[in-house]
Amino acid sequence: MNLRLDNVSKTYRVGSFGRGRLTAVRDVSFEVREGEVFSLIGESGSGKSTIGRMILRLLQPTAGSITYGDTDIASLHRRALKEYYRNVQGVFQDPFSSYNPIFKADRIFGMARTEFFPEVSGDEWRQRLHAALESVGLNPGDVLHKYPHQLSGGQLQRLLVARALLLDIRFLVADEIISMLDASTRIDVLNLLADLKARGLGVLFITHDLSLGNYISDKTVILRHGSIVEMGETEKVFGDPRHPYTQMLLASVPRLHAKWNGGTRARDLPETADLPPLIEIESGHLAAV
């Protein structure tokens, strides 16, 4: 099954007494398939994390729909919602925020067993748990009896991925998950995401880093002020960018595309609300031009 967004928007009430409106995401549509890495790339405030949180049901869209398979996730409750979370999980930029600091790692995994696998025996659960930890490069004896503050950021990220694997997920929302990690750990986590793809999982990779998006993703969406300005197969978006904003972003990373240096500046670009609709440049490549 695939994850699909159709004309999704998110507007917040802001200002005194909520009289103002701020549109964080505007009319966004795309589909993430199992077995592919799909990158959302944009600067701070582009709406990429808001999209990830809506997919995880942490936020509700103001308009549009998000479907998993044929089901609108807004309609899910109780058992159906629990099953959705068996298939779709998220890992965020700050791994410490996902843990209760007073619980050791084994207690955190124990709660996952109680919630999702109460019928599994203790011995079988330990076998599954150890296999999941080892599959993400962790030694169970080194991490299970430690508190979150005793583990590194990279270890905590891997624990979250191991928990997701225990649930037998089909999609992972990875929101800026390597931005706080050192260089060697970043490589390890990127390799882990590539391994998840090889297992047939879909990964929504949310990042502001064009180099990482280019390196890891099969398809790419470029966001500006909550709207899609360009979308398609990564090699086409990066190899032949059509929207001036995409060209400007690539020009800021010379090792990606030094040829996109025509002098376009952010202040020269139209506001996203004035963008024309996306048109298909060629098969697998759309841009708002």
Model-predicted segments: where are they?
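Conserved ABC transporter NBD signature motif
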Residues: 64-72
